[in-house]
Each structure stands twice: as C-alpha cells, then as structure tokens.
C-alpha cells in the first residue's frame, strides 16, 4: 500500500535454507497462480524508485492529515484522536444515528463513502480514509459537515 499499489499481491522471502527455497519453488504456482508477469514488473519498478514514491505518498498523507485535523477542529459535533501514522481515522459524531444508517445516507445524499464504525463494533463513528487527492478530501469533508448541519 505504501507504494500506491494496493491491488498487487506480491511478496518476497529471504532465507539461506535451501530446503525452504526448494519447497517454496515447488509451491509457487499453486500459491501465486494469480500473480502475473505484470505484477512482478510493477513491483520491481516500484522498488527501484521506492524512495521517491515513499516521499510523494508521505507528503500527501501529512498534508491530508492536517486538512482532516483542521476540519475536525473547525466542525461542531465531531471529534477524533489524531492519527500518528496510517491512512485512516475514526471520526466520532454527536448524532443519534447508527453508523451504518449514517453511511447509507451519506452515500445516497452526498456521494460520500465512509466505513461505518459498527464494522469495528464501535458505534457513533465512521472510518475516513485520507490517502488521496487533497482537494477531493476537503470537498468530501465539507459535504460531511453540511450533512451534519442539515441533520
């Protein structure tokens, strides 16, 4: 995920044990039948430029975390624990509506897609991802604020 290639299913194993290497080699086609040459190529390309990709993505996350933090501070009826790392946050809201119902309404009425807190056995909150375009994040948060004011 850190390389913005969350759809790739890749992994490497490092060992000096030749028996382990032989066993892995025998099972590779069975275990990774859906991983193709393109996946290998993209993963290799990402690793060849890992510092540049990491810094780009880190900059996006830091900027967006600040956008989210300012929004939480400026928006009445919401609170959260500011994330130290990661790409998501649990934002708590002060409305008497189950998180699943809230999320269904948000997607229907505002086009917003959040994960209900009930998915994590935590009512009264939604999980918000912030690892994408900063302008889109700000627009989405504004729509969420509008919804909270309207309801």
Segments (PLM) and residue ranges:
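PLP-dependent enzyme catalytic core of the Aspartate aminotransferase-like
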Residues: 96-97, 105-114, 120-151
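Residue-level recognition of strand-loop junctions within catalytic nucleotide-signaling folds
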Residues: 16, 48, 92-94, 131-133
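A short linear hydrophobic-aromatic micro-motif
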Residues: 76-80, 112-117
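Short, solvent-exposed loop/turn segments at secondary-structure junctions
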Residues: 1-2, 18-20, 85-87, 96, ...
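Conserved glycine-rich beta-strand-loop-beta hairpin in the small C-terminal domain of fold type I
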Residues: 44, 59-69, 80-93, 124
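Conserved core segment of the aminotransferase class I/II
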Residues: 2-62, 69-71
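Generic structural signal for small/hydrophobic residues in well-ordered secondary structure
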Residues: 11, 43, 61, 68, ...
């Amino acid at each position: 995920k850190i390389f913005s290639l969350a759809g790739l299913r890749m992994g490497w194993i490092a060992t000096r044990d030749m028996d382990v290497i032989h066993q892995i080699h025998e099972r590779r086609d069975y275990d990774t039948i859906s991983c193709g040459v393109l996946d290998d190529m993209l993963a290799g390309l990402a690793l060849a430029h890992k510092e540049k990709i990491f810094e780009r993505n880190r900059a996006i996350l830091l900027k967006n975390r600040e956008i989210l933090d300012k929004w939480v501070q400026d928006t009445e009826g919401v609170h959260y624990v500011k994330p130290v790392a990661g790409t998501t946050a649990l934002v708590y809201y002060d409305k008497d509506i189950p998180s699943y119902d809230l999320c269904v309404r948000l997607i229907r009425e505002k086009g917003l897609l959040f994960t209900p807190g009930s998915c994590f056995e935590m009512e009264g909150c939604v999980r918000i991802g912030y690892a994408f375009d900063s302008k889109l994040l700000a627009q989405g948060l504004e729509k969420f604020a509008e919804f909270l004011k309207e309801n």
